[in-house]
Amino acid sequence: MIFQSFLLGNLVSLCMKIINSVVVVGLYYGFLTTFSIGPSYLFLLRARVMEEGTEKKVSATTGFITGQLMMFISIYYAPLHLALGRPHTITVLALPYLLFHFFWNNHKHFFDYGSTTRNLMRNLSIQCVFLNNLIFQLFNYFILPSSMLARLVNIYIFRCNNKMLFVTSSFVGWLIGHILFMKWLGLVLVWIRQNHSIRSNKYIRSNKYLVSELRIFMARIFSILLFITCVYYLGRIPSPILTKKLKETSKTEEGVESEEEGDVEIETTSEMKGTKQEQEGSTEEDPSSSLFSEEKEDSNKIDETEEIRVNGKEKTKDEFHFHFTETGYNNIPFYDYEDSYLNMNGNQENWKLKDKKAAKRKELFRFEKTLVTTLFDYNRWNHPFRYIKNDRFEKALRKEMSQYFFQIYESNGKQRISFTYLPSLATFGEMIKRKISLYTLEKSSSNEFDKRWVYTNKQKIKNLNNEFRNRIQALDKEFLFLDILEARTRLCNDDTKNEYFPKMYDPFLKGAYRGRIKTILSPSKTAIDNLRDTIGINRIHSILLPDINIDYQEFEQKANLFDKKQLLTEMGNFLPLAGEFDIEQKSNLNMKGLSLFSDQDQEKIDFEKERKIFKFLLNVIRTYPIDQKIQKESVGIKEIIKKVPRWSYKLITDLEQQSGEHQENVPVDHQIRSRKAKRVVIFTDNKENTDPNKDNDTSDQRNEVALIRYSQQSDFRRRIIKGSMRAQRRKIVIWELFQANVHSPLFLDRIKKSPRFSFDISVLIKLLFRNWTGKGAKFEILEYTDEETKKEDKKEKDKKEENKRKEQARIEIAEAWDTIPFAQVIRGSMLISQSFFRKYIRLPVLIIGKNIVRMILFQFPEWSEDLEGWNREMHIKCTYNGVQLSETEFPKNWLTDGIQIKILFPFCLKPWHRSKRRPSHRDLMKKKKQKDDFCFLTVWGMETELPFGSPRKQSSFFEPAVKELETKIIKFKRAYFLALKVLKRKTKLLLRVSKETKKWIIESFLFLKRLIKELSKLNPIILFRFREVYESNETKNEKDSIISNQIIHESFSKINSPNWTNSSLTEKKKKDMSHRTSTIRNQIERIIKEKKKITPTPRIYISPNKRNWNTKRLELPKNIWQILKKRNARLFSKFNSFIKIFVERIYIDIFLFIINITRLNTQLFIESIKKIMDKSINKANKERINKKNQNTIYFISTIKKSIDTINNKTNSYIFCDLSYLSQAYVFYKLSQTKVSNLYKLRSFFHYLGTSFFLKTEIKHSFEKQGIIQNELSLKKLPSYGMDQWKGWLKGHYQYDLPSIRWSKLISEKWRNRVNQHHMAQNQNFKLNSYEKGHYKKQKDSEVYSLLNQKENFQKNSRYDLLSYKYINYQKMRDPSIYESPFQVQVNKNQDFYYNSNTYKHNLFDMLESIPINPYLVKGNIRYMEKNTDRKYFDWKIIKFFLRKRVDIESWVKINTKSNQNTKIGTNNYQIIDKIDKKGPFYLLLPQNPKINSPSPKKLFLDWMGMNEEILNRPISSLEFWFFPEFVLLYNLYKMKPWVIPSKVLLFNLNLNENVISNNKNVDGKQKTECVIPSNKQIKNKNQNQKEKETPADQEDLRSDAQKQGNLGSVPPTKTKQEKDNEEDYAVSKIKAGKKKKQYKSKTEAELDFFLKRYLVFQLRWGDALNQRMINNVKIYCLLLRLINPRKITISSIQRREMSLDIMLIQKNLSLTELIKRGVLVIEPDRLSVKNDGQFIMYQILGISVVHKNKHQTNQGYREQTYVDKNRFDLLVPENILSTRCRRELRILICFTSKNRNSVDKNSVFCTKNNSSQLLDKRKDLDKDKKELIKLKFFLWPNYRLEDLACMNRYWFDTNNGSRFSMLRIYMYPRLKSH
């Protein structure tokens, strides 16, 4: 039907059929199994690689295929499966075979007879090759498990109908795969042999001998490979002998001492009726599947069973649980039980005799079974299970217990196979069958049973139907509706006092209670005697007691008389066996119980009554053993419970073991791997005991103070049980030493990795452009100080980074030492030896050597000084962390845990000691710097500052000597330079003499010049031309240029990238270079200037102060050039950052282009497909569309469309996206199919005139719904708007999910949409009216406080409404007028906003006016009932409690322009349902002034953190792949609704400071108030303060997002409504909780406050503080051990090792202060949300249930509706009966479904007021209508929709604790068409 909407529908369906066919799937699975390569392939490869002849190849291939064929057949053929599937046999056979195989490979000649060509089959080696391949195929399945692919076959076979065909096709697929594989292998080998390049390789040619050797040893290589793979595979399954045995806990029962578990365990096999439960990857089996298949295999105990609470409620079954608990009989095996209760001798002596026999048998039996239990312990954790502690006293639950157990049972009088049979019942049945002769079973034939069964069923149905009819007929007679409902019976405790059971536990009212009540009653002795006197007998007794021959028929007719005593003994024997009675039977047999009968000795007991009594006895009564000392005999009754299997171990962690927290009965050794930690004892306090009475052993009480040192390494073994299968945690790679989370290799690309070959482009650019800055340019230093500070910051940052890196390296080294086995032993011994070597060998030798040399050099020896320094050096033993102990004391377990050796005052040998003069200031400063006068010893004898740090530079012995030498050289230099100065002075005198001579020569030259001048007057020839030159200016310019060039260099050195390493040497070189270049540049400039000098014109006045015009003209371009140069320099300085930005921009553009291409392509593709589909659908639907009422409907699966198209008014219906819908769509369509029920009134309805009887409104509504057809629209079918769907689902409370659930379900961002299309003209009026309505509604909804009481009724009524509307849709009037009866009765003043006009549906249409009820989410969140303080989510600005509910219009957006008062704009408004007097939350909604603006301003609160620009289109989950930037935002700012924020958890911190101070002052003895007082009181105290300023606490506890500034500013003042909310919040908390505990002190209360919630919290000190504290601890540890600690204390305080300020412990730190200081960090715990069956159901329906609440005050009108008591329209008739009768009726109808004509039997459900006549007379209904009703009955067979969900989803539902989830499938009635 759905495929018809596609153009290629038929083709697709054909393809689907082919793909899903058994043969294709089989071939596919078979082909897949080819790739599951295991050890069995090795033999196949071996035969191919080793050229041993074709015979071996053939035999290998044949064996391989035969083995695989056997495996495939074993899936189908049960005996073979059992033979191969028994793990112990396979293991026992496999291990010797492997040994034999390795032996055979190593001694090959032992078997080979030489090749006998006559008969190859006689050659043993060929046979062995065949066997190897065959057997290893079989091993591969069990002892050596291959990957999952091989097991897919087994999984699929359960789903497949034609199993043999599937097995065959999968084998064929496997064969094809293997043939291809072998061919490929052959080709590769041939290519290797023939490839010339490989053969001519020089390495291979040079090592020809090696190659031939390799061929010879190929067999050995293969056997080694095989051995390695076998070991590896066995590593995945812990070998039963090698794995860690867990010590069991001894079980203690009240009054009964039971034996140890080890004595009781027995291994049983898992075969039963050809079925087997397989445990993947484990050789041990699951006790859940253990049965008694053979007579030899007996069991003393199936498994220890206890009650288990699931989410605080018991999972129970209405079945008999025959679990054999250990009682006084527990020494007797089963067959003794049987003998005992069959022989029916109540003699005590017989019992004693049997005890002795049993003891003997037990001795033998223990010897027999020890082998099996030592090898295989089926209770061992072989999977990497983490141990979950559920209670202090109960053991962990066995989770892998299978619920599938196949057994034959009788149903409807015929034998059928049940796959959820009770194992215990089957075991019991087997046992009885074995022991009891068959005559009792053959007594009454099966037919008789069937007849009787069918007859009683018919009678019951008849009676119920009659009652039902009578009640409906009473309705016709207009009796009051409430009088007709069947009265519910209640369970009564005491008739006289009229005490009833609590409603919660009453099985009649609420169904079987799944909780647990433990009540101990003390009945009178008469009651016990009465029970002894009278107890009924029934058929079970006749089966169990072969002595009493009772004819069943006689038993039916007349009551049987019986002997009380005999029955009592017999009951005593039987009941312990049934596992429901614990009776202490040591001296005599006493039956304890409740009086169930009258005091008569003999009584006729009706069969029915007796059966009920016996059932009651089995299920309800459980007597407790009686203590002999107590006089009063008390009898305990336990409610119905479900026994669940538990592990027989109680395990503890390493930490618990060391701290000694575990209980007495728990094993001493830990079994759970905890985080790698070592307990370091830092101080032991030995107190001698003065009490002489005590033993000598305990005279010394050792109080150890210990620290626990955790390894920083990533440790993913944590909480795994020892001996569990670690290797099964597949696909986990740990590639770093410190890794926070385990990553799968699949997501390696998602992890941020720093690129290995990363280089800075800016550095290259600088290198390239540095020399382009030109010569002679001037530069200025801009913001020199900034540069300097940046430089300093960078240095600091680098220093920090370096420290961090060193710290990381230290930790890594420490962890490496910790992880390598025996490393600590080696390291410890090396350290000790190094310490000894240093102290007693190396240093003394050096001292002696030095002093001898001094004596040789005629110096005084310094023995005393050196020895003093040597004595001062102390070697202190420290723990691995560096906590000091003492010189002599070694840390506990130092060899395994590690040791450090700290050297205090390390001795440093000096060539000479200075005389002790007064120290100068400089020396003191030096000393201050060297305050850390200690070091740690390394393994190589070096010194290091910190443990595992890098070794520090040791001061050299010759350093002082070298320094002395240097000073002497300097002195020599000084003397030398003095001599030079003198020399210089002498040379200067000489120069002066030469100058004088020079002067004389010049003067003579000038005289000559003057002479020439005189001569020139006669002949005026210009000899020289002068030009005025300003030398001063020039020199200034030179200086400037020099400076500027230096500056250029400096500025560039600043720009250098951080990757540049600047050492002082390179700096020096750079400076030299810059200096040289500047000088050269100046010289060049001078030369150029010289060249440019022009001869001056004759009329030039040479003046030193004036410039002429020429020079100005020349200098102008020079200035311009300089300005340009400056600009260039700035440009170049910014160039690298510009280049960077440019490159990034290019990258971004490229990526965006790529992304957009893919996006656009997919978008175009999707849209084109959509258009095609739309066209075809529109053609098909043209007739159906009512043009007057065109609504746009967008379903959730609608692919991304722009807002324009969404708001487009002319859009037609779009159903195309429903092509993927599930049954929900089918329901929807069916619910719309209308068939007129008003068959008789058709003509009446079609009357066109004004009707006298029919109101026009009713007629119009009928026309609207398509019940009757208007003449004008006869040709057109009614429109398929959302109204009908909404109407149908409206009554069903379950399908209106909280918005959060929707957000989880749907990937689109519909919640951010704003309902933009509806805008009011008069905004203020709109707002005011809304506010009034809002408060009115709040007052009206007070009634909802009754919600908890009426919850059940409301649920039923809504369910009924849905079912009624669904089945009898054609009779319904306008859906939005009607509500469920309860709802309308209660809320008489409720407003109904019914929209008279058709309106546009915006993107989503959620259900209208259905409140989100609290019971929607109650069951889904853990701890909900226990901790009422827990919030669902609280998002700092929006307070949202679970106890109150709210429905938010889309998801509200809030603008930055926030007002004080809560104003609601049209763009963003909320609808608050009718819930509570005060608003459930306050929400700061600002007014949005620009209503019509298409682009809203930037919003500060988007619920998914998206901006409007991104949100122009709704994002479908598909498109996340094309929009990585969206994914980023989505993940970055995802609202975390399921996280409890710290603000809510610590809401008592909202108290102001003075309240806290008041609390502090309260004396401990006085009666203090509760920690969480009502905010009312606080508010009264500090109201003014609150209004003035925001409380500091509130600011502190803002969310991270707020702190980052994402959420903008929160207005400081609160509105009245908000305050009310706060007040109400605190009050409701106190009311909701039960009696609050009164705390002694604030600290206790705060501690309790923490422990109540399962918080993850930690103390965070600052790094510096942390380090200081650790240092203090280390020194305290040392001081504690010293006899006279004064000296060390003073020195450590001087050296600032010990901080005195930390020593003052602040005792009065309250929780609030700790949080304020940021010391205590609270990580909110995540609530685990349990998605049960309901959630899956929502998912089914959620596809097409789309809606958005409208609040249209302008268009709507209000209507008040009342409900008549006798109104019958909305009632599902079935509800007349009580729940029990209803259930019974349903089940009985199902049992007899095949004989039933569904319409006749159930026509009651389609009745109107004339229902009784309709039943009798109206047989001629329309055929269409019949078919439709039948179909509807099938789809809605008066069960909940959950059943359909089960049909759809839960075929294999293993873990929800319900065995009936699948049986529901069979409960649907069969339908026969007439």
Swiss-Prot record:
**The UniProt record lists the keyword Chloroplast:** yes
Does the entry feature the keyword Cell division, yes or no? no
InterPro entries named among the record's database cross-references: TIC214
- Region annotated Disordered sits at 248-310, 1567-1624
Amino acid composition bias (Basic and acidic residues), ranges on this chain? 298-310, 1584-1601
Q: Which GO terms describe its biological process?
A: protein transport
Membrane-traversing stretches: 18-38, 64-84, 87-107, 124-144, 172-192, 221-241
**What is the first-listed, main subcellular location in coarse terms?**
plastid
Pfam families referenced in this protein's UniProt entry, alphabetically: Ycf1 (PF05758)
Q: Where is the composition biased (Acidic residues)?
A: 255-268
Keywords attached to this entry: Chloroplast, Membrane, Plastid, Plastid inner membrane, Protein transport, Transmembrane, Transmembrane helix, Transport
Write down any Gene Ontology CC term: chloroplast inner membrane
Q: Where in the cell is it found?
A: Plastid, Chloroplast inner membrane
Q: How the protein sits in the membrane?
A: Multi-pass membrane protein
**What does this protein do, in the record's words?**
Involved in protein precursor import into chloroplasts. May be part of an intermediate translocation complex acting as a protein-conducting channel at the inner envelope.
Q: Indicate the quaternary assembly.
A: Part of the Tic complex.
Q: Which family does it belong to?
A: Belongs to the TIC214 family.
Task: Please identify the protein, giving its name as recorded.
Answer: Protein TIC 214
Write the gene name.
TIC214
